[in-house]
Amino acid sequence: PYNVGLDSAILMNPQVWVASGHVTTFNDPLIDCKSCKMRHRADKLIEGWLAENPMPDVNVEAMTNDEMVAFIRAQQIPCPGCGKSDFTDIRKFNLMFKTHQGVTEDTAAEVYLRPETAQGIFVNFKNIQRTTRRKIPFGVCQIGKSFRNEITPGNFIFRIREFEQMELEFFCEPDTDLEWFDYWRSFCHEWLKGLNMHDENLRLRDHEKEELSFYSKATTDFEYLFPFGWGELWGVADRTNYDLSQHQKFSGQDMDYFDQEKNEHYIPYVIEPSLGCDRVALACLLYTSDAADD
């Protein structure tokens, strides 16, 4: 009863991605091997090495770019391609696919393929709330294609450049966000267990303060034990009112909500469960294959 559906645009005004922070912050740490010229994601290079050389106190996701470079050099982590340990410094690689609209290829005509479905929900928040007459709390959900220019796609359909994503943006009162975060965290866990994913192959990992995204108050990742190691299936995040506030700032459009019962205005907080459909399908294929073998 709380939620409604949406099918938002894949190509949106490029200022949407400026407001959301994707143009400046949606980056992966790219590092090159000087010997064989192979390119790697620095964090994945370290994680691959740690899988064979466990160091429980090391949290890769909390590392800065400088810390990752220092760790790679201190541990003499080898290049998977040539075995040598001679890497460049890290440089930022933006994950958004860029294209051009119209007949001229100048910067004024640049647009992006959406890297997530969430922003299409945020920019339509007021339109949806008014037309559906929904009262807070309520959610807007959609399933659709997202696109990311991954540095190192691989592991079959786990990391690909075009993928199917399911996201729910659940809007709530600011003081109730952590309660709803716990609710959706529990809901997602039960949903995955309903697919017969066994607890020994499924874990919940709460982000430490140092690794939280800049917009997040709390985040939990649901990770599955794939043959290549633990990988994220689903993330649940408390995005606070960051996104709506940013779009209000950049667009000049009012994004607040008037609570008639309390006679007050506020910008809603958002709880976001974000699921990669392809990854869940891969996990299901793997554990059903294991069951058949047994």
Positions of predicted regions on the chain:
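Conformational gate/switch positions in structured elements
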Residues: 277-279
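Short active-site loop/helix that positions an aromatic residue
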Residues: 282-286
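Cys/His-rich finger/ribbon microdomains and the adjacent scaffold used
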Residues: 1-275
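Conserved small/polar residues in nucleotide/adenosyl-binding loops
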Residues: 287-294
